[in-house]
Structures are given as structure tokens and as C-alpha cells.
């Protein structure tokens, strides 16, 4: 789109209903602050400049909103005198001469570029105001969009609506696009002759019509326009976001056995032919390549899973876990900041942290990389085709060469050369009849003490 546009994002609310120590727009949806979701939609709508109207937590909100591709200028709203007043807080930016002014809200993280582009297209068609609306079966509480002959003639708040107007199911979302050349003049004409003494952006529709201009409404899915005022609504928005993203991934070739139990982050990348079993949680920063399987009850964050690898069930991949092709991290295993080579197997009950494990190496059950000395972390390096016996403790920093064999139960504190066998435990002793003596002694103690 060749037209210039300024997005004015309203994010100055006190968030009192959220009952939180931080602004509601900083609360995460799928691991990303609400305001950042809105900004992603703005950036994808051919908009580069943003006037961010902020109040509490101004610096934090501005930082969260400053995503790549956007130039964000904050404007602090010191008084709360309505939406019209909030937009005028960015007067300096509005005066720069943009073709379009798009007003949106920082607490509506489900918005997509579609409705925003549609509103801008309506301005390009010669309209002065384009209001984004939605149809709903439950319009109670919303302002109604009153349309005659295809033009929007008014936005009627429910308390002011007639019985006939209350039957209208096309409702105001609060988002709108305004002719940039007329924006400051129109905003300056909004009055506050109402019960609250506030300046309402919705008055612009009747103002522009009184001046001979045109207003229209464009439609959008109700779910995309959901705002968030409290924790219950935040949970609903999270649910809607997850449902939408799961659906997109399944249509792209990802299999989910029980999709309603899979929880994704804003940046989760799952390739075609990935299989996700029930009750899997993805934190931020996870990429899973084609043909990989994530078994049930696994948790992944900041991890990469290569083609054909398997994870879980009941596995945890922490930031820096990088699984090679065909590798396996099995049940009750935790991997953190570790490179796992192609075909390597970590099947059971193991902690691997700050480590490099070569291709085709086998890590036995109960193996622990002892990476922390109480102050610093240290690295464990294991070569290709090595075998680490069960219940081994590898005390870092330590290097185990290609093809080396670590006997079960060993505590390894020194480097092990390639193809060497290392045993780090006491030799087994057999003492005939000793068990019988111990048993008889214990029974005598028990009888003497009177304990059963």
C-alpha cells in the first residue's frame, strides 16, 4: 500500500480490574506481552510508525512494544479523559501529515492484519472514517453500529440506544481508521457534554457526517477483537490464541493427537510431519524439524529438535538443548545447554547440562553430568560412539573420547582417552554367610526393643 500511515496505540489504562502490579498490556499471551502481539499485527499491515499512548509502566510498555520494523514514539497520558483525549495525546505525531491514522488498543492481542488493512483500504476508497466492527450473538454492553445505505451514520452506546437499535448485532470494536489530513480537526471537535465529562472517539462518526464527509464500517471476526480487562478474560484470550495457532499448524502438516492439550508459544516452529502427543508444553524459542516426535507430558523451551529425533515421554528440554537428527531423549530426562549428536540416545532418568555428546553415543540410565561447582558451570564433552554405563556421574570439566566405555556406577573426574575403559568405583567384594549374620543380629535387636 503506497499510503502513509501512523498507528496510534492506546495503552495508558490503569488496569485496575487486572489486579496486578504491572500494566495489563504487559501480561503475556503465549509467552509474549499483549502489546507485542498488537505490534506484530501493525507491522504486518504496512505500517512503520507508531504513536504509543502510555501511562503506568511507560518505559516497560514502550520496550515491549518496540519490535523490529516499527518506529515507536511514546506519549504519556497524564489524565484519563476518554478515548478522544487519549488519541490527542499524540498530537505531535498526528501533525506529521500521514495519509491514514489507525487507532488500536494494546489489550487486543488477537487482532490480525486483515481488518486493519480493510479499514485502510476503506480510506483509500474515499471514506473519511472506517470503523472496525463485529457481529455477535451477545451484543449487550457494546456500542451498536448504525448503518444506512451502506454508510455508517452513528455509533450508539447501549445506554443511549432505542429498543430497535438494541436489536442491532453489529457492534463497535473501538478500532478505527481516520483520514490523516482531517484527523486533528476532527479530534478537536469532539466535545465532553456527557455524564462522565469525557471525550469519546465514537463521536467522530456523527461529526464527519455533519461536515459532509463519509464513514463506513468494516467487518472482522469477533474473536480477533477481544479485549482483556481481567484475569478471566486473559484466560479466554490465551485459549483463543492457542486454538487458532494449533489449527494453523495442523493445516500445515503437523499432527496433534489431542490438540486441546498442546500449548504453544508465540514463536513455536513445527515442521511438516511432526507428531505431538498429548499434554506437551512449548515455551518460547522452540524449533522442531520434520519427522520428529514429541511424546506425551514433555516440556520444551529454547530448544531445537532435528529431523527424526524423539523426545519423551516426560522429558524436559531447557534453553540451549540442541538435538541432532535421529537422536533420542527419553522418559524423565532433562537436557540443558547441550549438543546431542545425530543418533545419540539418552533414554532414561538422566541429566545432561553444559555438554557435548557425539553421534551414536549411548547414555545409560541415571547418568548425571555434574556441571556446577557451587559457583561456576563446567562442560562435559563426550565423543562419538561412546558408551556411558548406568548410574554414572561425570564430574565436569571432563572429556571422554570417541568410543570410550564408562563402567556402570562410575564417578569420572579425569579425562578418558578414545576407546579406553574407565572404572571409577570400588571393587565388589563377596563375604560368604555375612548376610545371615546381619539378619540374625537385626532380628535380635528388634526383639529386644519390642518393635514390630
UniProtKB/Swiss-Prot annotation:
One of its GO terms (biological process) is UDP-N-acetylglucosamine biosynthetic process. GO terms for molecular function: glucosamine-1-phosphate N-acetyltransferase activity; magnesium ion binding; UDP-N-acetylglucosamine diphosphorylase activity. InterPro entries: Bifunctional_GlmU, GlmU-like, GlmU_C_LbH, Hexapep, Hexapep_transf_CS, MobA-like_NTP_Trfase, Nucleotide-diphossugar_trans, Trimer_LpxA-like_sf. Residues 253-452 are annotated as: N-acetyltransferase. Its cofactor is Mg(2+). It catalyses: alpha-D-glucosamine 1-phosphate + acetyl-CoA = N-acetyl-alpha-D-glucosamine 1-phosphate + CoA + H(+); N-acetyl-alpha-D-glucosamine 1-phosphate + UTP + H(+) = UDP-N-acetyl-alpha-D-glucosamine + diphosphate. GO terms for cellular component: cytoplasm; membrane. Residues 232-252 are annotated as: Linker. The active site is at 348 (proton acceptor). Catalyzes the last two sequential reactions in the de novo biosynthetic pathway for UDP-N-acetylglucosamine (UDP-GlcNAc). The C-terminal domain catalyzes the transfer of acetyl group from acetyl coenzyme A to glucosamine-1-phosphate (GlcN-1-P) to produce N-acetylglucosamine-1-phosphate (GlcNAc-1-P), which is converted into UDP-GlcNAc by the transfer of uridine 5-monophosphate (from uridine 5-triphosphate), a reaction catalyzed by the N-terminal domain. This is Bifunctional protein GlmU. Its EC number is 2.7.7.23, 2.3.1.157. Mg(2+) binds at residues 107, 229. It is found in: Cytoplasm. The keyword Acetylation does not apply. UDP-N-acetyl-alpha-D-glucosamine binds at residues 10-13, 24, 77, 82-83, 105-107, 143, 157, 172, 229, 318, 336, 351, 362. In the N-terminal section; belongs to the N-acetylglucosamine-1-phosphate uridyltransferase family. Binds 1 Mg(2+) ion per subunit. Pathway: Nucleotide-sugar biosynthesis; UDP-N-acetyl-alpha-D-glucosamine biosynthesis; N-acetyl-alpha-D-glucosamine 1-phosphate from alpha-D-glucosamine 6-phosphate (route II): step 2/2; Nucleotide-sugar biosynthesis; UDP-N-acetyl-alpha-D-glucosamine biosynthesis; UDP-N-acetyl-alpha-D-glucosamine from N-acetyl-alpha-D-glucosamine 1-phosphate: step 1/1; Bacterial outer membrane biogenesis; LPS lipid A biosynthesis. CDD domains: GT2_GlmU_N_bac, LbH_GlmU_C.
